[in-house]
């Protein structure tokens, strides 16, 4: 959520910067609402002051033995007018809030301006794609050939975009998650967390999935009088970041660095027809998430560090990748700047996203009222929040199967994973 003061004082600038994201802000309507809000606010305060002043005179009139019926009637009339103005003001504030909640974050000035993914900017590459002297198989053929990926059973049990893994491939998938967690906790300074896979609406509002992206979620329990609705998490970013919702942490606690390995659930409502085969786009998938909560002046540097943590996973696994900075038109709703890390997939002969690392600045923190107390003046200030995949486990599995395949259909286990595989060097 954007800063209301900045929005009011710099409306034209806000509209201009949001336009680079493809979001058209109705400046005229918002200006009209703001004028109406001011007018109603003044009227409400004046009516409140008048009613209070006249109410005080009732006791004085009674003390003098005067008839107070007329004054009581006047107070009642002012009260009715005040109630009516409060209703009007609440309606205007609700509309303004709805508009504010629908606005994406302002892009950082360092984010390249562009309309879509074709205008993203590559910033670096690591490793060189392997040259094969035999016909390349994709991860689907490799996994099925090794009796490790069972798409048919998943369709029978649940439906499309799910997977059953078996044997050493299931073990490799588990090893990947453990390897990532160990790397981030022992070398990168993150604290591991075990978090709920079901979250309430307040949590999804806090991180920005609601109200705009409700159709992308799996909702398991509707809201009732007894409690809020629950939804399966689309990413562990939601529960991890919400750990500081409605909180004020001490400055000495920062930065807070959290990681979790969870299943994630997405309806993929907007991706009909995309990646219909294989593990690239599943309704249920594993991911190791990285979250950092930092002081505002530290967040841009923290984004570079967090992105480096995700890249380190690929380097340790020997997987070629490139890192691109997203242009304004391709960034996620809550992001001010995002790096996508794309791993090389020989089966597709292209780089595919395996991690997205973003600086949300105070966009999520304002929604969540997540703050820290500055030691110098003891005042609470909004945190800056960052998140990134470190990494998407299923897509990393895809990359290993395809990059480490052998001519006979077997797959070499990357050296970094062998301790997690009981010393196994090859699958198949």
Curated annotation (Swiss-Prot):
It comes from the Bacteria. The keyword Calcium does not apply. Its main location: cytoplasm. The keyword Ligase applies. Keywords: Aminoacyl-tRNA synthetase, ATP-binding, Cytoplasm, Ligase, Nucleotide-binding, Protein biosynthesis. GO terms for molecular function: ATP binding; serine-tRNA ligase activity. ATP binds at residues 266-268, 353-356. Its EC number is 6.1.1.11. CDD domains: SerRS_core (cd00770). L-serine binds at residues 235-237, 289, 389. Pathway: Aminoacyl-tRNA biosynthesis; selenocysteinyl-tRNA(Sec) biosynthesis; L-seryl-tRNA(Sec) from L-serine and tRNA(Sec): step 1/1. GO terms for biological process: selenocysteine biosynthetic process; seryl-tRNA aminoacylation. It is an enzyme of class 6 (ligase). It is found in: Cytoplasm. Gene3D superfamilies: Bira Bifunctional Protein, Domain 2 (3.30.930.10), Serine-tRNA synthetase, tRNA binding domain (1.10.287.40). GO terms for cellular component: cytoplasm. It catalyses: tRNA(Ser) + L-serine + ATP = L-seryl-tRNA(Ser) + AMP + diphosphate + H(+); tRNA(Sec) + L-serine + ATP = L-seryl-tRNA(Sec) + AMP + diphosphate + H(+). Homodimer. The tRNA molecule binds across the dimer. Catalyzes the attachment of serine to tRNA(Ser). Is also able to aminoacylate tRNA(Sec) with serine, to form the misacylated tRNA L-seryl-tRNA(Sec), which will be further converted into selenocysteinyl-tRNA(Sec). Consists of two distinct domains, a catalytic core and a N-terminal extension that is involved in tRNA binding. HAMAP family: Ser_tRNA_synth_type1. Belongs to the class-II aminoacyl-tRNA synthetase family. Type-1 seryl-tRNA synthetase subfamily. This is Serine--tRNA ligase. It comes from Shewanella oneidensis (strain ATCC 700550 / JCM 31522 / CIP 106686 / LMG 19005 / NCIMB 14063 / MR-1).
């Amino acid at each position: 959520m954007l800063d209301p003061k900045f929005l009011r004082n710099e409306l034209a600038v806000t509209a201009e910067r949001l336009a680079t994201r493809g979001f058209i802000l109705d400046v005229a309507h918002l200006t009209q609402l703001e004028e109406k809000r001011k007018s109603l606010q003044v009227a409400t305060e004046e009516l409140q002051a008048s009613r209070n002043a006249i109410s005080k005179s009732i006791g004085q009139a009674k003390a003098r033995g005067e008839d107070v019926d007329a004054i009581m009637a006047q107070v009642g009339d002012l009260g009715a007018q005040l109630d009516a103005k409060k209703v009007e003001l609440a309606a205007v504030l609700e509309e303004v809030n709805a508009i504010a909640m629908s606005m994406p974050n302002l892009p950082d000035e360092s984010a390249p301006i562009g309309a879509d993914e074709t205008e993203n900017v590559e910033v670096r590459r690591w490793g060189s794609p392997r040259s094969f002297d035999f016909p390349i198989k994709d991860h689907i053929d490799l996994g099925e050939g090794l009796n490790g990926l069972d798409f048919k059973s998943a369709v029978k049990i649940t439906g499309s975009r799910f997977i059953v893994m078996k044997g050493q491939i299931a073990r490799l998938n588990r090893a990947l998650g453990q390897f990532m967690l160990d790397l981030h906790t022992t070398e990168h300074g993150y604290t591991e967390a075990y978090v709920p896979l079901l979250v309430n609406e307040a949590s999804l509002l806090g991180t920005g999935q609601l109200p705009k992206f409700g159709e992308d979620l799996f909702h398991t329990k509707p809201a009732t009088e007894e409690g809020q609705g629950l939804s399966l998490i689309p990413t562990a970013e939601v529960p991890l970041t919400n750990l500081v919702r409605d909180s004020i942490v001490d400055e000495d606690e920062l930065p807070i660095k959290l990681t979790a390995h969870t299943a994630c659930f997405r309806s993929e409502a907007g991706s009909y027809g995309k990646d219909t085969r294989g593990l690239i786009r599943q309704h249920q998938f594993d991911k190791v998430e990285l979250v950092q909560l930092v002081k505002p002046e530290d967040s841009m540097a923290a984004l570079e560090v967090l992105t480096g943590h995700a890249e380190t996973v690929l380097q340790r696994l020997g997987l070629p990748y490139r890192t691109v900075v997203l242009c304004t038109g391709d960034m996620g709703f809550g992001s001010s700047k995002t790096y996508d890390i794309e791993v090389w997939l020989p089966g597709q002969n292209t780089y595919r996203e395996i991690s997205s690392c973003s600086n949300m600045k105070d966009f999520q923190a304002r929604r969540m009222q997540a703050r820290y107390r500055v030691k110098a003046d003891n005042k609470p200030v909004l945190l800056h929040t960052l998140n990134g995949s470190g990494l998407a486990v299923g897509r990393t599995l895809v990359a290993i199967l395809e990059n480490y395949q052998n001519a006979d259909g077997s797959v070499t286990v990357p050296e970094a994973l062998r301790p997690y595989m009981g010393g196994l060097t090859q699958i198949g």
